[in-house]
Amino acid sequence: MGSTLTKSSKETMHAIENLELLDHQLSRIALIANADHRLTQKKQTFILGPKAIDDGKPDDPVEKQKRLWALMRNLPHYPPSAEMLQALPTEFTDKDLTTQNAVFAEYLTTKRLEFYNVCSVMQTLLTIEDLSTMQLYALLLQPDVAVQRVGKLSYKIVLKTTSVNAEDVVAPNLDEVVLVPKSSLIASPLPKNLLMALLPHANEFLEKNDPQRRYVANVDQVSRTTVHFRFGRHNWPGDDILQGQGFCAIIRSRRTPFRYMYRALKLLQESPLVRRYLFPFPGWLTQMVDQSKIQLRDCGTLPSWMQAKPKIETVPSQAILLLNPTIYSNTEQFQAVKRIVAGPSTEGPYIVFGPPGTGKTTTIVETILQLRLLQPRSRILVTAGSNSACDTIALKLCEYISSNERLRKHFAQQEQPKPDRQLIRVFSRSIHHKGLKTVPPLLLKNSNCSKHIYEHLGVSHILQYGITVATLCTVGRLVSDDLGKHKFFSHIFIDEAGAATEPEALIGIMGIKQTSDCHVILSGDHKQLGAVIKSNRAASLGLSHSLMERLLRSDCYKVDANGNFDRSLQTRLRRNYRSHPEIVRLFNELYYNGELIAQAPDADVNLAENWALLPNPRFPIIFQATHGVTKREQHSTSSFNQLEAQVLCWYVKRLINDGLGHGKRVSQEDIGIVAPYTAQGKLVTKLLQSQGHPNVEVGSVETYQGREKPIIIASLVRSFANMGFMRSPRRVNVLLSRAKSLLILVGNPVTLRHHRDFKSIIRECKNQGTYVFKKKGAQQRPEFLPDVYEEQSDEESSSESEDEEDTPWFARMPQDISVTTDKMEKRFSVSEELTKAIRNHLCQLSI
């Protein structure tokens, strides 16, 4: 393969950009960016020569644009490669992953995502997660089932015994049931690797009356033993076919989110300018580019993605008249608004780091409205991984737009968009199927379901609005509808960015950001819950890290020892307006290096100071010692603790019946129950309903992320067992930071003291006199708890315990919040036992 150089500078630039001729060399320069080398590097001039090109021809920009548009429009199924399928049985060992993959082999050594390897590495990690998810669906395959009619177009099948709980795997309104007649099975048997049977088959598209036709329906409901599904009118085969024979039933995911992520990575591979933006150069390297100390041998110019970007001047603060005047007194919030409105750095995404209760949503809402006021031509996309995050921002925007006189006058004077088309909340069809009862009327009015009927909005409709709010997956659908072809949006706001994997965040960027004047703003907190990853292997290799987290660890975004950082790239919110100062102090010292400042009004957070059951009125945190037993339901990964559930309900009854003292009543809506396991949540819900408190909200830690309640009562469930996923410091951080006025933790201290963070919490509660347990002659506690001489038993067990590092449930937390999944951590994932069951099941079905 010969080396060919083009003479034209323009042609050289295109060849370099598309074929990534400098990727690896440039990244090598960036890797030496440590303190000992920076001065030396600044004085050097790097001469970079082009790599060999197969045919020596530059990539035509018109053809490249056509290829990008084709990528956006199409959404292939992205079946797993043969190499990845072969690596699955051995759980993706290093050897399997690095065979014929030099890029990933290097990544395993460095554990660094770079400009040149991000697409290849992320595709590998995403495939591991994809296959791990498909494994669970493969276990639900039913070789011979009868279909039972339950209503018009609605049917069900009864599941035979499986090693997984269908409720833990199958998603109603999103997943599908494929009914395969025996005639179709004979003509086209299932593949030996049953994971491939989860992909669409050609026989699904035959004529209805074809005996080999496979019938596809949408899952309606799922329980441990049954799956209910519904056909559309266009593909209903009729009762005579469905109830007259047995079927092989395949329960599968459409894999739509995975397919959007695969496509985003493909688009990123084709877009060096966007990759340059997502991997910003450190300051010393940018200076070298400015000073032309990086040169191309025999070439006329640097590629555009290496060229220096113009600096942007800040808009004077007096030019911004805030809609929410409270932001004037919050230096960090005001800084974020001014910086984004002025135009954040074009070197990389702008980050609003918002710890719990610091007003992140308030800041983002104000910024979006100021952009629409001061930059009428701006068009804004607001997106997040969850519907709840999208709804929160969209509702606050709608409230301002509908009630603020200044906004209404301003929008009335604009020709485009029209006053009634300032914002559109785009719901997915699946959300419409689930029901819109919980969606506020104002938000519903400004959505594609305004008449309680789902309306599929085309791109031409979206282009009529100033602000579009949609989940990341819905943005992926809009990209398929050619939204990217219009280069429409000037700003992309990704909320809860710390809770999305990097490929997930890319769904909201790729196909949308195609020019340097489209700004990306990431808001969130990477120290709270991240993305849910089913594969421990994928998580440990880096899939669990968010784009936001990676950027904050890079040189450009780092905070130095004196607390200084580049304010053109980020704002760090500090002032907590949610919780009692002692509650803030608890999670502030554990997770935020004491950077947060408690500023909630006393009247809002001192509600429990006169409560009879609070031993210390100045410290509204109780640790209720409970020595229950952790149990697990059959065929389920979820745990429950009967005694802790009873204790939770006892506290609820006392709070509602007795109030908080001095006439302060407590409603059911004031209390939030956090049950980290689904089984515990179901048990607590049942007990609360039986005692007449059905409106007390019970949810997981994930349910409460981004939310708050005056009173939070949490059951930690794990007792005389390993900590399970409660070992995660991010999970504990969310748990501690939801309560405004009162936090009650119910758990087993003997188990929890082996966890660094819970050990600290228990110690603090003991010091403050709020560590409580039942013993004779003491203050009233749940009468069903056994009498325990807690101090003596705890001291004895402590002195006789094993060394902490040898204890299975001990968690040594690093100073950095990010924790790589340990083999001992029992998350909802494919465990060793489950993997064996999968192998056996697949072997039996393929015989």
How would you label these PLM feature ranges?
Residues T6-N74, P79-L88, F92, G151, ...:
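Pre-ATPase regulatory/linker segments immediately N-terminal to the P-loop/RecA-like helicase/translocase core
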Residues T361-P376, K396-E399, M510-G511:
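Walker A/P-loop NTP-binding motif
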Residues S345-V352, R377-S378, G466:
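Pre-Walker A (Motif I) flank of P-loop NTPase domains
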Residues S386, C473-V475, D482, K487-I847:
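Conserved helicase motor core of SF1/SF2 NTP-dependent helicases
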Residues T346-T367, G706:
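Walker A/P-loop
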Residues T12-E20, L323, R377-I492, A531-G542, ...:
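Conserved P-loop NTPase motor core of helicases/translocases
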Residues T162-A166, R214-V216, L323-N324, V337, ...:
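Eukaryotic intrinsically disordered and solvent-exposed regulatory patches
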Residues E167-V178, Y328-Q333, P356-I364, A389-C390, ...:
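Phosphate/oxyanion-binding active-site loops and adjacent basic polyanion-contact surfaces
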